[in-house]
Amino acid sequence: MSAVDAIINYKRSPNEDFYGLLHCDENSSPEQIQAEYKVLALQYHPDKNSGDKEAEAKFQQLKEAKETLCDPEKRAIYDKWRNSGISMSYKQWLGMKEHVGQVRRYTIAEKVDKESMHWVTPKTKDRMLPETGGAAAQGPGTGAGCSSGGLTAASPNPAHRRASEGGAALYYGSRKGEWGGENTDVANKFRNYEI
């Protein structure tokens, strides 16, 4: 079975519900969780159930649940997984923890070297075509001998940015002079459907 099939066919096990294992609620304090654990640990402790592998496995699950829910950092991570609706086990999700929530913006030339489980789309997307370099491509007045007001690779031409990124408005033909060259806040808000 492939990883994709495992995710599609995943059914959450009752053993992954740490709150249910300890017979407590999501709002239970660490003291309440500890008290519930003690009652259940006495019932399933390996010393009381010698040779019973099922009771030993249950005791290990209870111990893991207690350790996770009594540690505030681990509990926050567990609650994030529990409420996310992600179709993978908690242990599998923990194994991918360093990837979760990371958003990297890759340039066209950069390789994608890590998986990511972050589904939020970044505000700025990669360009379809890479930025062209060189003085000839930059246009007049932007060459290497320009004053400090010239454009450099660190400060690209604002006309090449999207309107949503605060770039200049697009124009075609000779209409540039009619609307004015300045980019006002009201015009930007209108273009971005904010008013």
UniProtKB/Swiss-Prot annotation:
One of its GO terms (biological process) is chaperone cofactor-dependent protein refolding. Expressed in the head. Residues 17-82 form the J domain. SUPFAM superfamilies: Chaperone J-domain. GO terms for cellular component: cytoplasm; cytosol. Residues 126-163 are annotated as: Disordered. InterPro entries: DnaJ_domain, J_dom_sf, JDP1-like. Keywords: Chaperone. It comes from the Eukaryota. CDD domains: DnaJ. Pfam families: DnaJ. Disulfide bonds: none annotated. GO terms for molecular function: protein-folding chaperone binding; unfolded protein binding. This is J domain-containing protein. It comes from Drosophila melanogaster (Fruit fly). The gene is jdp.
